[in-house]
């Protein structure tokens, strides 16, 4: 798009309004480089980014990047094998820290569905090792002692020397205080000295480094500290050398990652820019417009972004409307209306929110042209007309059906009759070329053109004859009328004279009366529309209030539900503990076989609702603070991942435990099981509910479940359920299981086959007989 239109409509001033909402230099640079786009997909993507940022603010009450410098120049220097200075390293350190913070924010993000922003969040790369290395430089620009052992040693020696010097000088102060001009230790040329009275300069042996302007004080470095000061000077040089080496090493660590760090910096800046767009939208009560696909546009209550308290107006360009002609006298706001339309389009095509109401729709134009300028004096009329015509010629030679043309005072600056004819001919050319055009004129002849010509519509700016002031309201469909007679009458001109003037222009008076009636009807319609909008706003406020109350109720409901779930889980755990005790006693008395004990326990567990308390903060804290007792061989345990009971059989050298769980021997870490007697057993995570059906009844009691139905499951969910199902089957001594996966696309079926092929407790597997499901069901033999 041509850049001339940006200057004509003062688009850079609009962009400046976004500056106060941006925190990073990268976002400021992106704003400076922002120009209108012509690709609808790119524009829509930026609108989606703003919408998703709005949802983040609503759900999480904020989002911030922090103040970040532009690091493009330091990164360029790294690529040239240059070493960075401390301030440049601090700038990169802050970018890496902000990147890590943003990644954590995204990981903790809940209740927000992201599409456009998700792509940005997931492209951020973390550099924990680089962050750790850069911690050796604090934000004040100081290299910490721990940056290297050598630096730490140098600074330790410096402190020792400095302490020794101070102690020596303090001793001199005590003994020779009467010889000193001031009872303090001064510094000259980086060396510690004493301010000695000139009369005693020969009483203290040492080197004179300075004399006061009055000559009464001599700054002497006592001989006793000269050697120490020399050592400090050398240590300072060593310190500078070591710090330079550290900066070189840090630069070398960053060098291989310049591209990724640059990408992170761009994402942070772009995120900040999106945040700024949202804050502008929120503060200015702006909106994200819809995008039409047929060059129609509808702007509801659109406002000029650069005016203070602008009047809001509605404007539409339907598919069958090509030209809008705004007629009527000057100073009514016609030019402002032209600029308002142009700026709304430029802002929207730049991915910015516009000052309008919801339901507004913009078109996507490949070019926007304008001829807008203030009228010049009569003496300059020729140059004014020539200037306008030069612009018009350029526009007509370049514009096409994908363009928007804005012309102010078309045909002005020449003979009125010729100017009106020329204006009409130009508008007709634009109409026939199907170029969307809005033009202003004060020529009354164009009113008839707007009424009589297809795809052309008149418009005007409302004028309040009671106050004799323009209202700046845009009245589409109503041509402008002359208010000269009414103004003259209200200003006190003799009524006889006014009547005589009206009689001399009977035809024009009839037209004006018709226009006046149209204006009255339009004003009445606008009042009704405003009333409807007010009602809609009240309904919107009511809906928001109801939604807020609902959210508060839902929050309290969730808290009470979690509390109830905890109480229920405690009751269930107590019952399960009692059942464990009963079954153990029966087993000890050899009244049940081992596999019958496991089977009975499984049936008892089915009575317990599996309550998900994994998000219960109180329980998580209690779990962390529980008094742990060291496990021993022979202890009964609960395997956390499966909720199954087992027994510890031995402990390996690496600290892991061997456990017997049903038919399976497992190697477990200490945090992968809990002791049966520990209170924390009540806190085990909720097991994944497995979709199974019972085996055919072979005895009077229910048998263990041996069929898993994975139809309709997602891949990850299906694999989790399959893994848990096979473990449960092995623990219940099942020899054969059925897995129903259906045929479908074959993804789940292939995944089941791969899983069974790798499992060491699956002897063999095959598809079920055709009568029992065929290739939609797999039968696996366990052992």
Curated annotation (Swiss-Prot):
Family annotation (PROSITE patterns): DNA_MISMATCH_REPAIR_2, SMR
Family per UniProt? Belongs to the DNA mismatch repair MutS family. MutS2 subfamily.
Q: What is this protein called?
A: Endonuclease MutS2
Q: How is the quaternary structure described?
A: Homodimer. Binds to stalled ribosomes, contacting rRNA.
Q: Which domain of life is it from?
A: Bacteria
List the top taxonomic levels of the source. Bacteria, Bacillati, Bacillota, Bacilli, Lactobacillales
Q: What is its EC number?
A: 3.1.-.-, 3.6.4.-
A Gene Ontology biological process in which this protein takes part is: negative regulation of DNA recombination
Q: The Smr domain covers which part of the protein? A: 708-783
Q: Which InterPro entries match?
A: DNA_mismatch_repair_MutS_C (IPR000432), DNA_mismatch_repair_MutS_core (IPR007696), DNA_mismatch_repair_MutS_sf (IPR036187), MSSS (IPR046893), MutS (IPR045076), MutS2 (IPR005747), P-loop_NTPase (IPR027417), Smr_dom (IPR002625)
Q: What is the species of this protein?
A: Streptococcus thermophilus (strain ATCC BAA-491 / LMD-9)
What GO terms are given for molecular function?
ATP binding; ATP hydrolysis activity; ATP-dependent DNA damage sensor activity; endonuclease activity; mismatched DNA binding; ribosomal large subunit binding; rRNA binding
**Amino-acid positions noted as binding ATP in the UniProt annotation, renumbered to this chain:** 328-335
């Amino acid at each position: 798009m041509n850049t001339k239109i940006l200057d004509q409509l003062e688009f850079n001033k609009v962009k400046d309004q976004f500056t106060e909402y941006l925190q990073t230099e990268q976002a400021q640079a992106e704003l400076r480089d922002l120009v209108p786009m012509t690709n609808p997909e790119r524009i829509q993507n930026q609108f989606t980014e703003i919408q998703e940022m709005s949802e983040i603010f609503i759900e999480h009450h904020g989002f911030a990047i922090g103040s970040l410098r532009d690091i493009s120049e330091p990164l360029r220097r790294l690529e040239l094998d240059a070493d960075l200075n401390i301030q440049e390293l601090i700038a990169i350190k802050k970018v890496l820290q902000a990147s890590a913070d943003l990644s954590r924010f995204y990981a903790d993000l809940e209740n927000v569905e992201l599409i456009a922003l998700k792509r940005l969040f997931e492209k951020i790369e973390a550099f924990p090792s680089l962050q750790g290395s850069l911690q050796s430089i604090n934000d004040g620009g100081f290299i910490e002692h721990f940056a290297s052992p050598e630096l730490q040693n140098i600074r330790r020696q410096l402190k020792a020397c400095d302490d020794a010097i101070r102690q020596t000088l303090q001793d001199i102060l005590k003994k020779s205080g009467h010889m000193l001009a001031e009872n303090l230790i001064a510094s000259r040329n980086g060396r510690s000295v004493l301010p000695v009275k000139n009369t005693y300069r020969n009483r203290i042996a040492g080197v004179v480094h300075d004399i006061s302007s009055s000559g009464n004080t001599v700054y002497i470095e006592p001989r006793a500290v000269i050697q120490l000061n020399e050592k400090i000077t050398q240590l300072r040089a060593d310190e500078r050398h070591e710090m330079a080496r550290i900066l070189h090493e840090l630069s070398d660590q960053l060098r291989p990652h310049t591209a990724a760090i640059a990408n992170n910096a761009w994402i942070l800046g772009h995120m900040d820019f999106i945040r700024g767009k949202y804050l502008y939208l929120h503060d200015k009560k702006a909106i994200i417009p819809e995008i039409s696909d047929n060059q129609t546009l509808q702007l509801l209550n659109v406002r000029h972004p650069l005016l203070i308290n602008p009047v809001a107006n509605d404007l539409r360009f339907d598919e069958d409307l090509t030209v809008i002609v705004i007629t009527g006298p000057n100073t009514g706001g016609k030019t402002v209306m032209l600029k308002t339309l142009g700026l709304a389009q430029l802002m929207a095509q730049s991915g910015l929110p516009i000052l309008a109401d919801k339901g507004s729709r913009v078109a996507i134009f490949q070019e926007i042209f304008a001829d807008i300028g203030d009228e010049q004096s009569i003496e300059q009329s020729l140059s004014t007309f020539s200037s306008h015509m030069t612009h018009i010629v350029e526009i007509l030679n370049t514009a096409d059906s994908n363009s928007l043309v804005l012309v102010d005072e078309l045909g002005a600056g020449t003979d009125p009759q010729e100017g009106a004819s020329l204006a009409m001919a130009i508008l007709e050319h634009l109409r026939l070329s199907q170029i969307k055009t809005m033009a202003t004129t004060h020529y009354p002849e164009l009113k008839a053109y707007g009424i009589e010509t297809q795809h052309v519509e008149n418009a005007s700016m409302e004028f309040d004859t009671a106050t004799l002031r323009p209202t700046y309201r845009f009245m589409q469909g109503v041509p402008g009328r002359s208010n000269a007679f009414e103004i003259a009458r209200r200003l006190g001109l003799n009524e006889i004279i006014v009547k005589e003037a009206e009689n001399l222009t009977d035809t024009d008076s009839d037209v004006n009366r018709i226009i006046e009636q149209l204006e009255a009807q339009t004003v009445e319609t606008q009042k009704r529309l405003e009333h409807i909008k007010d009602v809609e706003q009240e309904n919107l406020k009511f809906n928001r209030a109801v939604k807020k109350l609902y959210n508060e109720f839902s929050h309290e409901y969730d808290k009470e539900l979690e509390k109830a779930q905890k109480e229920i889980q405690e009751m269930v755990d107590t019952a399960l503990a009692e059942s464990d005790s009963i079954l153990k006693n029966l087993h000890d008395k050899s009244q049940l076989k081992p596999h019958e004990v496991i089977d009975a326990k499984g049936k008892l567990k089915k009575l317990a609702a599996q309550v998900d308390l994994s998000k219960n903060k109180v329980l998580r804290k209690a779990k962390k603070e529980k008094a742990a007792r060291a496990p021993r061989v022979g202890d009964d345990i609960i395997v956390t991942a499966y909720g199954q009971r087992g027994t510890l059989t031995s402990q390996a050298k690496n600290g892991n435990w061997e456990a017997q769980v049903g038919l399976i021997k497992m190697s477990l870490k200490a945090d992968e099981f809990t002791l049966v007697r520990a209170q924390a057993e009540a806190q085990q995570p909720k097991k994944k509910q497995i979709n199974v059906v019972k085996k055919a009844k072979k005895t009077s009691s229910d048998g263990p479940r041996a069929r898993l139905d994975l139809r309709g499951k997602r891949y990850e969910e299906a694999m989790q359920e399959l893994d848990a199902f096979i473990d449960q089957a092995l623990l219940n001594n099942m020899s054969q299981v059925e897995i129903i996966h259906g045929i479908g696309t074959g993804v789940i079926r292939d995944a089941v086959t791969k899983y069974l092929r790798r499992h060491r407790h699956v002897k063999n597997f095959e598809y079920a007989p055709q009568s029992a499901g065929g290739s939609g069901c797999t039968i696996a033999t366990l052992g």
